[in-house]
C-alpha cells in the first residue's frame, strides 16, 4: 500500500525555529485545517502539544473534534452557525449577520477584513459590529485578520497591517485582554510580529516558505508488478510512452484516485528517486523504471507544483486521507 512518511524530527525542528522567531510556543497558533495540509492532524497533534503548543486552528467542528483532546484552545475558521455550537471551541465570526445565529455564551474571534475582501467585517463597520456583539450573549475573546499578499513585495501587506492596527485601537476601547493574530506563514519572516499578537502558522510548519526549514512529508508507493518492456512496446493508456530499447519497468500502487494530479504522459515528471514516470498515470497506479519494492514519489511538493503549474498547497492537501501516515 502507498505510504506517507512524516519526519518527526523535521517537524519538531521547524516548530522550534518558528517559536524562536515568534518568541515562545505560547504565542503560536498551529493551523491544522484540511488534515494539517494533508500531513495528518491526529498524527501531528501530540507532537505539537508536547512541544508546548496549546492553540490550533481548523476548518470545521468535525476537524476540531478529532484533535480536541490535545489542545486547550481550538479556533474553527470556516463555521456556518447553526445554534448548537460547542462551548469547548472558539468560532470565527466572519460576517456580522451571523451574530444572532450562534448559540449563547459561545466564544468568538472577530474576523476583520483589512483588504483581502474575502471574509470579515471591514474597519469602517467595526463600531457597529461591536455594538451588536456587546448586546448579544457571545463572548468576544479575540480578533484577527488574514494577509492577502504577504509573500509578494508590494504595498498591500503594509496597508493591511495598518488597517489591523486601526481595528485593534477601536476594539480596545470596549474590550480588554483580547487575543490578536494577523501574521500568517507568509508574513512570519517579514519583520517583527507585534508584541500583543499571536502568529498563525500553516504550511510553514511543514517546511515550506523558508530555506531554513525542513520538509516534513514524503510520499511513497509500493510495487505491484514488474516486467521487461521490449523495444517498440508501449505502456499504459493510449500508449503515450514507447520504449526505445529493452527496459525493466514496474507498476506502483499510487494514482490519481489517491489525490495526485493526473500525469498525462507529456513532459518529464521526475520522481523522488530521480526516475521519471512512464506513460499516463492510471486511477490507482503509475509506471516507471523498476526501482525496487518501494519508491519515493516526492519529498518536496514544490517539484510537482512546478510541473503542474499550481501551488504546493494544492499538491499536499489533495493527498487522500486514507493513505497511511506514519512517523519516522
Curated annotation (Swiss-Prot):
Pathway the protein acts in: Amino-acid biosynthesis; D-alanine biosynthesis; D-alanine from L-alanine: step 1/1
GO biological process: D-alanine biosynthetic process; peptidoglycan biosynthetic process
The reaction(s) this protein catalyses: L-alanine = D-alanine
Record's keyword terms, sorted: Isomerase, Pyridoxal phosphate
GO cellular-component term (any): cytosol
Binding site for substrate: 118, 283
Superkingdom: Bacteria
EC number(s) given by UniProt: 5.1.1.1
Modified residues (N6-(pyridoxal phosphate)lysine): 33
InterPro entries per UniProt: Ala_racemase (IPR000821), Ala_racemase/Decarboxylase_C (IPR009006), Ala_racemase_C (IPR011079), Ala_racemase_N (IPR001608), Ala_racemase_pyridoxalP-BS (IPR020622), PLP-binding_barrel (IPR029066)
SUPFAM superfamilies: Alanine racemase C-terminal domain-like, PLP-binding barrel
Active site: 33, 237
Cofactor (UniProt): pyridoxal 5'-phosphate
Keyword Zinc-finger: no
GO molecular function: alanine racemase activity; pyridoxal phosphate binding
A Pfam family per the record: Ala_racemase_N
Cysteine pairings via disulfide bonds: none
PANTHER family listed in its UniProt record: ALANINE RACEMASE (PTHR30511), ALANINE RACEMASE, CATABOLIC-RELATED (PTHR30511:SF0)
Assigned protein family: Belongs to the alanine racemase family.
Chain's role: Catalyzes the interconversion of L-alanine and D-alanine. May also act on other amino acids.
Protein name in UniProt: Alanine racemase
Organism of origin: Campylobacter jejuni subsp. jejuni serotype O:23/36 (strain 81-176)
Amino acid at each position: 500500500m502507498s505510504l506517507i512518511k512524516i519526519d518527526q524530527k523535521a517537524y519538531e525542528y521547524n516548530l522550534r525555529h518558528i517559536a524562536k522567531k515568534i518568541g515562545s510556543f505560547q504565542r503560536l497558533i498551529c493551523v491544522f485545517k484540511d488534515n494539517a495540509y494533508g500531513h495528518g492532524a491526529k498524527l501531528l497533534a501530540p507532537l505539537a502539544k508536547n512541544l508546548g503548543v496549546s492553540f490550533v486552528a481548523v476548518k470545521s467542528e468535525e476537524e476540531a473534534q478529532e484533535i480536541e483532546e490535545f489542545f486547550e484552545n481550538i479556533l474553527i475558521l470556516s463555521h456556518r452557525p447553526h445554534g448548537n455550537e460547542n462551548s469547548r471551541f472558539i468560532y470565527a465570526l466572519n460576517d456580522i449577520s451571523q451574530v444572532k445565529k450562534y448559540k449563547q455564551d459561545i466564544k468568538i474571534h472577530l474576523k476583520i477584513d483589512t483588504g483581502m475582501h474575502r471574509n470579515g467585517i471591514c474597519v469602517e463597520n467595526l463600531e457597529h459590529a461591536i455594538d451588536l456583539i456587546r448586546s448579544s450573549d457571545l463572548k468576544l475573546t479575540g480578533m484577527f485578520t488574514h494577509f492577502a499578499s504577504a509573500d509578494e513585495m508590494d504595498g498591500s501587506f503594509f496597508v493591511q497591517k495598518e488597517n489591523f492596527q486601526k481595528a485593534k485601537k477601536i476594539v480596545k476601547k470596549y474590550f480588554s485582554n483580547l487575543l490578536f493574530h494577523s501574521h500568517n506563514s507568509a508574513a512570519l519572516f517579514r519583520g517583527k510580529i507585534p508584541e500583543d499578537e499571536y502568529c498563525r502558522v500553516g504550511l510553514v510548519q511543514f517546511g515550506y516558505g523558508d530555506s531554513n526549514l525542513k520538509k516534513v512529508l514524503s510520499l511513497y508507493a509500493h510495487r505491484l508488478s514488474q516486467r521487461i518492456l521490449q523495444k517498440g512496446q508501449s505502456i499504459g493508456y493510449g500508449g503515450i510512452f514507447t520504449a526505445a530499447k529493452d527496459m525493466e519497468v514496474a507498476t506502483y500502487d499510487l494514482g490519481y484516485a489517491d489525490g495526485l494530479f493526473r500525469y498525462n504522459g507529456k513532459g518529464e515528471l521526475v520522481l523522488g528517486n530521480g526516475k521519471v514516470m512512464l506513460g499516463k498515470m492510471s486511477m490507482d497506479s503509475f509506471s516507471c523504471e523498476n526501482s525496487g519494492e518501494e519508491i519515493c514519489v516526492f519529498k518536496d511538493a514544490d517539484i510537482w507544483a512546478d510541473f503542474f503549474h499550481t501551488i504546493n498547497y494544492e499538491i499536499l492537501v489533495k493527498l487522500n486521507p486514507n493513505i497511511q501516515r506514519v512517523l519516522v
